[in-house]
UniProtKB/Swiss-Prot annotation:
Pfam families: H2O2_YaaD. It comes from Pseudomonas putida (strain ATCC 47054 / DSM 6125 / CFBP 8728 / NCIMB 11950 / KT2440). Belongs to the UPF0246 family. This is UPF0246 protein PP_1289. GO terms for biological process: response to hydroperoxide. One of its GO terms (cellular component) is cytosol.
Length: 259
């Protein structure tokens, strides 16, 4: 089983990585093509394109300018440790063991607007480029057109490498839309996390994002390999709802959100 998650806007390049092991992103030719195009944009154009403040636009213009195809631990950091945010708070990669990182490397992928698909130990230089960005390019009107069926093909290869065909989708709609289902040779398992509010179970974004990270951690640490085993997930009060679930759409409920 292969798990996919979204990246994060928040990055941490200050905290030293907890592992010295690293790999290099596999699709840097694609990334470099995007970088070359992004370098042609002024900070004002970046601000308008990405809906960023002038300060953030300037920061990311500088990031695009300093990006280099030569990745080292001095200018980059392992993706799973560089990303922060709600999903990554739940995943808590800093406390994973070396064996956990080894398992994650084969069974977890992060979708990315710039890198396409990242493995946990792939070095990543800092960037901001959300998948939904309407960056017109030689392949079409946006990043979905740029990546086309490539991400699906790479996921197919990763699944083939582990001899499986189950893809666990813990990514947002924005990012999973970059996976072209028609080109994907996999059974996709979707998951919803619902918290009780005013007597009803609802998807609450902050809690759901954190839960996606917690389930990713659960899969890594428990070496989960089948959808059936996912039903055992019970972190921070969540429990599997057989009533609300379908074979390829699992639903987990929580009565009292943990603070």
């Amino acid at each position: 089983m292969l798990t996919v998650i979204s990246p994060a806007k928040t990055l941490d390049y200050d905290t030293p990585p907890v592992t010295e092991r690293f790999t290099l992103p596999q699709y840097l030719d694609e990334s470099q093509a995007l970088i070359q195009q992004l370098r042609e944009l002024s900070p004002a154009q970046i601000s308008e394109l990405m809906h960023l403040s002038d300060k953030l636009a300037g920061l990311n213009a500088a990031r695009f300018g300093s990006w280099t195809p030569d990745f080292t631990p001095a200018n980059a950091k392992q993706a799973l440790l560089a990303f922060k945010g709600d999903v990554y708070t739940g995943l808590d990669a800093e406390s994973l063991s070396e064996d956990d990182f080894s398992y994650a490397q084969g069974h977890l992928r992060m979708l990315s607007g710039l890198y396409g698909l990242l493995r946990p130990l792939d070095l990543m230089q800092p960037y901001r480029l959300e998948m939904g960005t309407k960056l017109a390019n030689a392949r079409g009107k946006d990043l979905y057109a740029f990546w086309g069926t490539r991400i699906s093909e790479w996921l197919n290869q990763a699944l083939a490498d582990q001899g499986d065909d189950v893809l666990l989708n813990l990514a947002s709609n924005e990012y999973f839309s970059a996976v072209k289902r028609s080109a994907l040779k996999a059974r996709v398992i979707n998951v919803d996390f619902k918290d009780q509010k005013n007597g009803q179970y609802k998807i609450i974004s902050f809690y759901a994002k954190k839960a996606r990270g917690m389930m990713s951690r659960f899969v890594i640490q428990q070496r989960i390999s089948t959808p059936e085993q996912l039903k055992q997930f019970d972190a921070q009060g969540y429990y599997y709802s057989a009533e609300q679930s379908k074979p390829d759409h699992l639903v987990f409920l929580r009565d009292h959100p943990a603070e």
